[in-house]
């Protein structure tokens, strides 16, 4: 099938249409059921991580190799000429892009992926995270996981819990789900970490229902998806952190009134916001969610590098 993602830069979720998101989700499901180990045979993909990463880098590199591609690159730029010789990001991108067919990049600077796309000489750039800005491939694996567990991406009640102010994963996933029909959001956070105003304004403009909460227990029975995030200790003094942290810990006991189909997701790593007794419940799905990153990234790479599949 022809696809509009061929040779497209993947920089942010708002730039992807509902149809493109559905195509990625469908392709990920197909690749999970039936591996295709030669989809990007003879293609070379750069995996350039200018800040440390574990899950995203390993997931991407596994995805590349499992569909037949070769990978070059680095993790943490401390030993590269960019760091040691003062080379600009734009120069690095121009050189590296001349070696490869696609360019996967994580960078601590917001907007770095967009900048890279302007200097990649037409080689598609895939944003693996640029500061607190966007992390689109995390959103793609989240969407695939939701579709896999619920059988749909329309008609869902979804709660985000914890750090909604700084968590780029919840911003991107909210924007993605807003493209679907009859989605209701529950934003559960302390006032200091509430969902940014611009996200709420986007939902208001689109006529999408959402509600703000400071406690999660009351909303759990309403949910299809409960998306937990880590409250970042470094943003609070010790006493304030201890109070906030204790209000946003999910236990198995809190899930007793949950719908049978509820799945608990988390972008990982978790610290103590989900207790280990939740792992044994049928609602826990965060480790399978992480595994799905390989399939979602396989699908994205295959679609970006092939005009038809």
Swiss-Prot record:
GO molecular function, one term: amino acid binding
InterPro entries, A to Z: Asp/Orn_carbamoyltranf_P-bd, Asp/Orn_carbamoylTrfase, Asp/Orn_carbamoylTrfase_sf, Asp_carbamoyltransf, Asp_carbamoyltransf_Asp/Orn-bd
Pfam family, one: OTCace_N
GO cellular component: cytosol
EC number: 2.1.3.2
Keyword Transferase recorded: yes
Membrane-crossing segments per the record: none
GO biological process per UniProt: 'de novo' pyrimidine nucleobase biosynthetic process; 'de novo' UMP biosynthetic process; amino acid metabolic process
Sites where the protein binds L-aspartate: 85, 168, 230
Biological pathway: Pyrimidine metabolism; UMP biosynthesis via de novo pathway; (S)-dihydroorotate from bicarbonate: step 2/3
NCBIfam families: asp_carb_tr (TIGR00670), PRK00856.1 (NF002032)
Function: Catalyzes the condensation of carbamoyl phosphate and aspartate to form carbamoyl aspartate and inorganic phosphate, the committed step in the de novo pyrimidine nucleotide biosynthesis pathway.
Assembly and oligomerization: Heterododecamer (2C3:3R2) of six catalytic PyrB chains organized as two trimers (C3), and six regulatory PyrI chains organized as three dimers (R2).
Family: Belongs to the aspartate/ornithine carbamoyltransferase superfamily. ATCase family.
Name of the protein in its database record: Aspartate carbamoyltransferase catalytic subunit
Organism listed in the record: Vibrio parahaemolyticus serotype O3:K6 (strain RIMD 2210633)
Gene: pyrB
């Amino acid at each position: 099938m022809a696809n509009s993602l061929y040779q497209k830069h993947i920089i942010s979720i708002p730039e992807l249409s509902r149809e493109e998101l559905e195509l990625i989700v469908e392709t990920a499901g197909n690749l999970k059921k039936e591996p295709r180990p030669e989809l990007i045979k003879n293609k070379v993909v750069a995996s350039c991580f200018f800040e440390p990463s574990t899950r995203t880098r390993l997931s991407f590199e596994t995805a590349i190799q499992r569909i037949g591609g070769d990978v070059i690159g680095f993790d943490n730029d401390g030993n590269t000429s960019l760091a040691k010789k003062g080379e600009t990001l734009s120069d690095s991108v121009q050189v590296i892009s001349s070696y490869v067919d696609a360019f996967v990049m994580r960078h601590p600077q917001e907007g770095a992926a967009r900048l890279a796309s302007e200097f990649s000489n037409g080689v598609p750039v895939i944003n693996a995270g640029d500061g607190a800005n966007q992390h689109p491939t995390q959103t793609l694996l989240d969407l695939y996981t939701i579709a896999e567990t619920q059988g749909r991406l329309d008609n869902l009640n979804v709660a985000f819990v914890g750090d909604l102010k700084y968590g780029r994963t919840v911003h991107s996933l909210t924007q993605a789900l807003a493209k679907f029909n009859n989605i209701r959001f529950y934003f559960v956070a302390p006032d200091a970490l509430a969902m940014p105003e611009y996200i709420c304004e986007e939902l208001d403009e689109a006529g999408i229902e959402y509600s703000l909460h400071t406690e999660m227990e009351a909303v759990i029975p309403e949910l299809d998806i409960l998306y937990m995030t880590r409250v970042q200790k470094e943003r609070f003094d010790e006493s304030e952190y201890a109070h906030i942290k204790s209000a946003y810990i999910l236990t198995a006991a809190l899930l007793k009134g949950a719908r049978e189909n509820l799945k608990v997701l988390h972008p990982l790593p978790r610290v103590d916001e989900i207790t280990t007794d939740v792992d044994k419940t049928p609602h826990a799905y965060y480790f399978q969610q992480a595994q799905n990153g390989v399939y979602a990234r396989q699908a994205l790479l295959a679609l970006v590098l092939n005009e038809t599949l």
